[in-house]
């Protein structure tokens, strides 16, 4: 059995988990998240802990028990604490400005690049070269950060572009004559 799937998910105070036939929904201060129930995994709630059991001994069911456990854990952490990704803009004249649920980027193109934030996601720019994306859904936060980074990824010679705050970009040496 999956080692991840064996460990239960503890439910903190202020988080409500409901398990229906086809859906698991988690409700908390950060909002409501839901996940489609997998037929290969049986989810049960015992005294504030969620346990995940594969319905049979197949390899696929064992793998799915770990996957479903981690997805539900991400939902519980998301509605209680939330997730955030930080991006940094490096380059002369590179700027970001957040207004409401829109993000405007001036990153060296002849036109500004605009992003519309999905529901449940907030974006902030503490400085013009920093972007902070926050939300309850880990997948959406990471996907949005990756899409913003993909507009102008860091180039290998000077390191200019958009990178994650904790990302290390290796700088190549220029060609010598």
Swiss-Prot record:
Matching PROSITE patterns: RIBOSOMAL_L6_1 (PS00525)
Any one GO CC term of the record: cytosolic large ribosomal subunit
Protein origin, superkingdom: Bacteria
Its biological purpose: This protein binds to the 23S rRNA, and is important in its secondary structure. It is located near the subunit interface in the base of the L7/L12 stalk, and near the tRNA binding site of the peptidyltransferase center.
Listed name of the protein: Large ribosomal subunit protein uL6
Gene Ontology MF terms in the entry: rRNA binding; structural constituent of ribosome
UniProt KW keywords: Ribonucleoprotein, Ribosomal protein, RNA-binding, rRNA-binding
Organism of origin: Acidovorax ebreus (strain TPSY) (Diaphorobacter sp. (strain TPSY))
Upper taxonomic lineage: Bacteria, Pseudomonadati, Pseudomonadota, Betaproteobacteria, Burkholderiales
Binding partners and assembly: Part of the 50S ribosomal subunit.
